């Protein structure tokens, strides 16, 4: 069986947020996948596709796996968006410098959409978020996902406080 040529995992960093966008491993490639996760300091994986591997090995390495699948090519449900943004806010506040991995099948649609939502909620314009991710992950997003991101209205849930306890709401006029 021919192996699909999969893009390498890419790290997306913005403000205090670090994400790793990747494709899904199989049980056969799981050890290499875990090595990659550890290299980037991943503590949580969000799996947005159907399960293709047993999470026991990953969990044994201290990496928490969350299953939030949604249909390929489609936008995430409001419930998934709410869970994702809550996770991002809590993880980066409680574990500064940590990295959240997100994967779908190829790492080109569903996973980049969630990362783009975090960037938009962090203050980036939708066009900039798309371009920022596409610079690292060529071919990311289909037209339906782009339309979803364009229409998405941020709730500004990812405003973090600085070390003095002040909200980081900087605005350039």
Curated annotation (Swiss-Prot):
Disulfide cysteine pairs (residue numbers): 49-104
Example of a GO cellular component annotation carried by this entry: spindle
Region of interest (Interaction with ATF5), ranges: 97-132
E.C. number: 3.1.3.48
Record flagged with keyword Repeat: no
Modified residues (Cysteine methyl ester): 170
GO molecular function, one term: protein tyrosine phosphatase activity
InterPro entries: Prot-tyrosine_phosphatase-like (IPR029021), PTP (IPR050561), PTP-SAK (IPR057023), Tyr_Pase_cat (IPR003595), Tyr_Pase_dom (IPR000387), TYR_PHOSPHATASE_DUAL_dom (IPR020422)
PTM note: Farnesylated. Farnesylation is required for membrane targeting.
Keywords for this protein: Cell cycle, Cell membrane, Cytoplasm, Cytoskeleton, Developmental protein, Disulfide bond, Endoplasmic reticulum, Endosome, Hydrolase, Lipoprotein, Membrane, Methylation, Nucleus, Prenylation, Protein phosphatase
Topology class, membrane: Lipid-anchor
Position of the signal peptide: none
Keyword Flavoprotein: no
Subcellular location as annotated: Cell membrane; Early endosome; Endoplasmic reticulum; Cytoplasm
Family from the record: Belongs to the protein-tyrosine phosphatase family.
The protein, known as: Protein tyrosine phosphatase type IVA 1
Organism: Pongo abelii
């Amino acid at each position: 069986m021919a192996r699909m040529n999969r893009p390498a995992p890419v790290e997306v960093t913005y403000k205090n947020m670090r994400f790793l966008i990747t494709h899904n491993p199989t049980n056969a490639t799981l050890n290499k996948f875990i090595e990659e996760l550890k290299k980037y300091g991943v503590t949580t994986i969000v799996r947005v596709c159907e399960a293709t591997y047993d999470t026991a090995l990953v969990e044994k390495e201290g990496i928490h796996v969350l299953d939030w699948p949604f249909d390929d090519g489609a936008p995430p449900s409001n419930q998934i968006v709410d869970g994702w943004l809550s996770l991002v806010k809590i993880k980066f506040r409680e574990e500064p410098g940590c990295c959240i991995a997100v994967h779908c099948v190829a790492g080109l649609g569903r996973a980049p959409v969630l990362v783009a939502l975090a960037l938009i909620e962090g203050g980036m314009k939708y066009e900039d978020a798309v371009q920022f991710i596409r610079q690292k992950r060529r071919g990311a997003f289909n037209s339906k996902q782009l339309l979803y991101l364009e229409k998405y209205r941020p709730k500004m849930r990812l405003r973090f406080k600085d070390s003095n306890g002040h909200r980081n709401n900087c605005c350039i006029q």
